[in-house]
Amino acid sequence: CLYVRFGSFTNFLWFQDTLDRWGGDIRNLVAQRGISYGLNQRTQKQLVLQQSALGRLFGEAAVADAAIVGSDMFLPEGAAMGLLFQARNSLLFGSDVQRQRREALKQNPTAREEQVTIQDRKVSFLSSADGIIRSYYVADGDFHFVTNSRHLAERFLQVSKGQGALGASQEFRHARAQMPLDRKDTVFAYLSDAMFRNMAGPAYRIETTRRLQAAADIELAQLALLASATEGSPGDNLQQLVQGGFLPPDFGQRPDGSQTILGDHGIHDSVRGARGFFTPVPDVEVRAVTPSEAAAYARFSAYYLAKWGKIDPIMAGLRRELLDGGKRERVFVDVQMSPLNSQTYNFLASKLGRPDQVQLAPVRGDALSFDVILHQQRLFGGFRDFGPPTDAAGEGLLAAVGLLPFGRLRDFLYGYVGTVDGSLGLLDFLNRRIVTPPDAQGYSATQREIWRRQYDRFTVYSLHYEILAEVTPQLRFEPAPRPAQFRLRVGDISENRMAPLANRWLFTRSRETSLGNLRLIHAMMQQLHVPGEDAKAAAETVLDGTLVCPLGGEYAYRKSAQGGGWWTSTALEQTGARSTPPPNFQAPPLSWFRGLDLDAILTPSRLSAHAEVDMQLPK
């Protein structure tokens, strides 16, 4: 299973707050996305577990520990997952859970609560007709489990009887030996081999394929409903949409007998419910398969066994500490695949050399540097902190980031690469192009000005003579905190001299994303003839998400004097057509990333990485 333990209620709140800070999508750390699926909010709504101000205040007094348990990670469609709490005060915690469930019943007329029997126990099951609420609540002593999956509720009760506990497995005991409790991780995550095998099994795989088809059918039906409404055609049911030519004649025919339904609660699947809140995969019984499904699974299974064979258990530990008076946070992350199967180890070991516990000392002026020990070579390199050429702005933004002839591209390849102790390996293709003998200081070059310098133990190449002159005297080894075969160091990119150009490029990307959302809304108005004020909501219904302006603005409908109107973003109204960001704009990761140190090691028993990330906390 998937197991994520927090160790305390405070850590659990930090995890939730971090997700909320980035719109519930960790990918927003790299670049702001144009659509939010609100996955964290969806999960809380479905489980009927909302964090209140009072709960935050007294949560630590009521909850000793918390964990996420699941059997897959299909969050956009609806994952099989639950929240497990160890209560300090079971009466207080249980009362709060029951209070939230009573409030949900009052607020949702279609919601109902029933007592279902699971493992000879009465379990509270709260559900709504559209599947948006689906919550099993069961307690055993001080352990309280809230889940959207009957299968997981059953597993919880089985474990309470001592049957099939994760903690009893040899793999998990090995994981905890590698990452023991005394590390005091903020978050500990474990993905077992059994979870991967279960997800690759026939029932799970086939139902996963079916639910993807069900989601596609719902989206198609929503588009058909919009088209019929704007054309004034009947659209009270799917049959009318088929007769009107908005859906194909064979629409909705699926092997398991499920179908798309257009009813009082919108468009949903007859077996799985509303899109984004689908019934968890393990709760949908696969009773029979078609020949085409069997053939498709056979192809998948053959590919899986040939390419993956066995996915090793994955464990991760995350710890954090505040820096700079609470203005920054350093996050320590350890990730391991262990135990490592021989096939994976042999493949990687054939590429890598033996780990050692020395590293290249930081080179002054490097924005990024790496060091990797290969089979017969130690390769290192760096990218220097430099300002863009003074005429880069005149070349246009795409030209400025490197889409130029070689004569200008070299101005942006401002770095170096080298090796140690004469073994050229991958760099031999550069060495063969050297046409001049080394001078007294070890410099030589090709006809196209690729420079090489042989300095002490090091052989270093660059497109720039001055880089070799700056870097090579600084090259030396120093003790490393851990043995490793790969090391990566990245400085504070917000202070990099290339940061303004990077911010400009990221602003342009974000601006295009915002404009892309507006084009979609415009298409709703022009092609489907959706009324202007309703066009954004219609687009969000089709996408099953919320359109977000990555520039930080809000989408707004503006009416014209002639009676029409258009959609725009308040941020775009302020910036206009300019391609340069406003003074207060700082795109991710420039807004938060302040440094990274990473190292990785391969041994016969494990593949592991350790990273330390410095993050700027929002004001």
Regions found by a protein language model. Give the residues of each.
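Signature of soluble extracytoplasmic/periplasmic domains of secreted precursors
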Residues: 1-619
